[in-house]
Amino acid sequence: MTCSLDFSWLRWKWRTQDGFSQSPSETTPLLSPETDRQSHNTAEQRVVYPNNSMCHQDWKKVCRRYPGNSICTTKYTLLTFLPQNLFEQFHRWANLYFLFLVILNWMPSMEVFHREITIFPLATVLLIIMVKDGIEDFKRYCFDREMNSASIQIYERKEQRYMLKRWQDVRVGDFVQMQCNEIVPADILLLFSSDPSGVCHLETANLDGETNLKQRRVVKGFSQPEVQFQPEHFHSTIVCEKPNNHLSKFKGYMEHPDQTRTGFGSESLLLRGCTIRNTEVAAGIVIYAGHETKAMLNNSGPRYKRSKIERRINTDIFFCIGLLFLMCLIGAVGHSLWNGTFKEHPPFDVPDADGNFLSLALGGFYMFLTMIILLQVLIPISLYVSIELVKLGQVFLLHNDLDLYDEETDLSIQCRALNITEDLGQIQYIFSDKTGTLTENKMVFRRCTIVGSEYCHQENAKRLEMPKELDSDGEEWTQYQCLSFPPRWAQGSTTMRSQGGAQPLRRCHSARVPIQSHCRQRSVGRWETSQPPVAFSSSIEKDVTPDKNLLSKVRDAALWLETSDTRPAKPSHSTTASIADFFLALTICNSVMVSTTTEPRKRVTTPPANKALGTSLEKIQQLFQRLKLLSLSQSFSSTAPSDTDLGESLGPNLPTIDSDEKDDTSVCSGDCSTDGGYRSSTWEQGDILGSESGTSLEEGLEAPTLSQDEPELCYEAESPDEAALVHAARAYSFTLVSRTPEQVTVRLPQGICLTFDLLFTLGFDSVRKRMSVVVRHPLTDEIIVYTKGADSVIMDLLEDPACESNIDVEKKLKRIRARTQKHLDLYARDGLRTLCIAKKVVDEEDFQRWASFRREAEASLDNREELLMETAQHLENHLTLLGATGIEDRLQEGVPDTIAALREAGIQLWVLTGDKQETAVNIAYSCKLLDQTDTVYSINTENQETCESILNCTLEDIKRFHEPQQPARKLCGHRIPPKMPSVNSGAMAPEIGLVIDGKTLNAIFQGKLENKFLELTQYCRSVLCCRSTPLQKSMIVKLVRDKLSVMTLSIGDGANDVSMIQAADIGIGISGQEGMQAVMSSDFAIARFSHLKKLLLVHGHWCYSRLARMVVYYFYKNVCYVNLLFWYQFFCGFSGSTMIDYWQMIFFNLFFTSLPPIIFGVLDKDVSAETLLALPELYKSGQNSECYNLPTFWVSMADAFYQSLICFFIPYLTYRGSDIDVFTFGTPINTISLTTILLHQAMEMKTWTVLHGLVLLGSFLMYFVVSLIYNATCVTCNSPTNPYWVMERQLSDPTFYLICLLTPVVALLPRYFLLSLQGTYGKSLISKAQKIDKLPIDKRNLEIQNWRSKQRPAPASASASASAPATGTVHTRPPCHPVPPEAQQNFGASTSKSSGPPRQKHVEDRVLQDPRCSREHSRDDTCTVDTLAKLSSGECLLDPNRTVAPTAYSRGQKDVSRHSSKGSHRRSQSSLTI
């Protein structure tokens, strides 16, 4: 991808160096005007002709060949149901195996059972599955019939009007008209919308689960709402891509009769299954119909994964097959030897029709096949059916666990993959996203920096310290927090827009522009009179308390902006102009949709209920009390000077920003601390409106009075970052009023409405990492590009054209850039998400040239994405930096506790995030992924040789203090240490953490350094991958999963996590605020990260333990029962006969012993949930497969052989010498084996309930009831033998009772003795936990506390720090790294109050840096590492040129100035920080 972009950029530069002088045919062959209208490549493109009178013949030739809109999701018809269903069922190996045995049994020479008897089990299974498939298919048929019969208005060519027809009558090329609330019947290209702005609102919940509305706009050139769309006047040909399943990707162009082309994309495509909302009428032409629609192409079945236990079962099945082969071979050889003892043919041997007898060899071969029929149950085919039933029961229990239900979102766990529940108990590695997974993804605006001046928003930080108190005071308070300016305007309403020049301004009370509403009213048991909930608009996110100093400057900027068309503008780099552009960028540069609360989404809602009068009076009283506090506190507020330029004074105690010797400027009010007052616990209400606003109590009440008629605006955004920035701008009265595909309207603080022409929108993508909008300013008529994006990208695109002619401006911009970068580092270390805001003014001529190429790129089909990327990159350069924002994404509740528990469970946790390194590191400390006692290695490099050298040096350094605790594992020829290393000396070495970025990952993957990287990670307690792309995330997961052969789990909430989720053994999606892509691609979906704790530690452990022990029991049960028939062959001449009735053998597995294992697999609990949560280390039993592995399998097989010997030979010795018949001998054996197997099951059960007892007792009693009825009624059911009255006679024989009591005791005695030893002297964690569970609650809690104190000894660093000097413990450094003396100075003087944890004194920080880390160093291609510097406590060199402590920021610090030339950004540096 990188190579293709580089080549495209070179081609673009070559193409544009002559000033866009090429013609369209020279630049893009696809867009050549000489292209013939009919020369379309139908093999790679789809050509759609309209179904009207003009193009009907072309439509018949081309479009009639496309599939219709009728869907058929059924698998069968009445004629094909029986043969097709049988054909599908016999694709299963188990059914083929049984069919093979039935065919063998039908051969006269190998008939063991009656033919009807052998058919019965197979026919029963086939019939049950056939009925199930038939019912499911009939339901699909009913659904298809309902969908196909739905009505829609289709344009009829002959009648020349829309007529009501069925969905199944829709064809490609038809014109379809839809009303509000109708479902889109096919994939339709939007050609008309009744919305004045040419927009159609869609609800895509049926398609992707997202509830916020989407906008689709009419194809360019057709947006004329005042003119009704006439299909007969549409003569264009549509060329688009072939049908595919990409919901968000679509490209094509419309070729008009004059051979001009208009491009379109997914923004104009209405997908089948979506619902039209808030749009009266929408019309379009059908592009894809029926099974070719994107919705149908995405309608795949549930994902299938094979669990680890299932793979283990398949291996053991082969062992059983080998055992079956051996037993059959013994039977065949024994049969031949038995017959060989007769001198002549045995008297019971029957000749064939010709009088010939079988030879001994042929008779032995037939006996081999006969023994396969006889011992067929040795292969536990029914085990797979039991496993499916058990997993259904486990999923049911998961769904009904209230602890996995989130009340706030009204979501519970979803199990999308039903066959891997047991894998939840064997996870060894977890790969987690950060944003929305560890954090809430509820973005809160915290701080900002504008042209080098930092505004800490102290009052906003104080307000966020007590969100609960704010929420309880009602919604009325929120509307006052953005009323920072008094109403200065007269009556009247105006929207200001440029139509070739600026028009006079008119004042307005409010912005009354046409707004299409699409907010929703959600029912929560009562009618909410406040603003209904919308996406990313909780009270914490919407309410922003403005900074006092910035508030006054914003007012000046708004006044300057208002009069910028009547007087000469200030210099382009003035603070006032930059502030105005900054807030305009926050308001405009997004994709936020605007609606009003007075026009809810068109659905049937419940009428409002009357609210109690007392509640309203209380709210009014609270409101007046708050406003009184406001008016009192404002009298004590100080007035901050208003900056008009960068060099003006910023305050009496603050340095000027033009001074080279001073540090960056932080414009904070009052006694603002360096962290923005995050730790403040009080809130001065008077700081909300600002000291200079001059708003008295009466004015504060007047403002909302003037705008009572104005509908409350609400915003819906696809990204929470965008919503946070829009609400922040609104807090400063830069309000986004409306947005259409063509225009965006912003209301200024004075009430003036500016309507910008929205020329182009360059959406965000993961490659560019930014988005831009191109607008025309309504006052200056300038074309402006507003860009926002990651600082790692924006900083490299800054190059103001004014710097070429003005050296002073260049110096000033460099200082702004340097100080902004320092503020960004501060925000990142405080755990804030950062975005840079920039702008660019484009000449009209240059823009027109660029726009022509952009339109060509939009209209192309070949390399469309590449061409769009080229045009965007060409425009987004030479930017002017406006400022940056810091947005807080709070940790979810319970995340630190969950991570700590998962760690104690032996799970390795990696965080893979696209955020910048400093932000991710701070969040890692906050969520306890990294501890202040850890030694953290931070590797940043782009060069492969340097990366290899750093990895080698790091490994050498780590190995001096760590050595493998267990035997190393092989990894592709290399020795890999275990993940829990120990220490050479008696003292415990600090834990290791690794931080790595995306550039380094590229070097690792491209340089074949995966093995070294994995070897390093095995020593690390935590691994943090920053700036990683979705592809890199999936590559890391696959690398660890395949190379280390471990069980992996990926968890995320966004579309960028889909590849990572799909690559892991288990993928978990979080139902967050970034859509449902992650959930739809996951195996399990949860609402919060903290649910992962119980999901894995409790349900995961239970699911694995239950299923594993049930599988082992199934193998034991079948082998034990089959061996009874095998031992009998030694006493019947290996004839293949049985001493048990055939029907009794069938009933044994079908009824008598089938239900207890299923109940055991669903409900058994070896350890209680409370103990599992209190002792997470119990989870390791599943990781080590203690319940089901090769030793446990063979121990169970040996036990089965022993018990079968006892169950056969004790009755044999008892009845030896008697004259009983075969069934009288076999009935006690059958009864004893059933009793032994059920008692064995009872001994394995760890939890006893009434249901367990009823099932076991019921199975035992069922055996006697069925046997008594069968033996009394079935006289000739199994001729020539006669089981008549056998059980009745046995029940009157005391010997029967004696052996039925004695034999199971002898058979189960060894297992009972072994279980007793394990329970008394067992050293396993599970055995100890089971003992604790049996204690009373008080003693149990005390034992758990003692266990935790033993398992978690005090860190060795605590004792080491007592004897260590204040500067910290010094580790022996590798001899290959000299330490320069200047690197050992102490920079840790400042203190920290930020949310990140403080670094303790015994922590050692070291840095390895590459010579290429700054422009002053020579660019060296060698992989040597120059420096290993040991720093004092509190330091963390996040890059080689910076020495700022990780959690502290002081204006008094002197940092090394940053080289600001292009290409010197720290992304190009190579460093290793420890």
From Swiss-Prot:
Residues 19-43, 638-707, 1348-1421, 1434-1474 are annotated as: Disordered. Residues 19-30, 1383-1397 have a biased composition (Polar residues). The keyword Membrane applies. It is an enzyme of class 7 (translocase). Residues 1459-1468 have a biased composition (Basic residues). Coiled coil: none annotated. It holds the Pfam family Cation_ATPase. Keywords: ATP-binding, Endoplasmic reticulum, Endosome, Lysosome, Magnesium, Membrane, Metal-binding, Nucleotide-binding, Translocase, Transmembrane, Transmembrane helix. Mg(2+) binds at residues 433, 435, 1053, 1057. It comes from the Eukaryota. GO terms for biological process: lysosomal membrane organization. Autophosphorylated at the conserved aspartate of the P-type ATPase signature sequence. Component of a P4-ATPase flippase complex which consists of a catalytic alpha subunit ATP10B and an accessory beta subunit TMEM30A. This is Phospholipid-transporting ATPase VB.
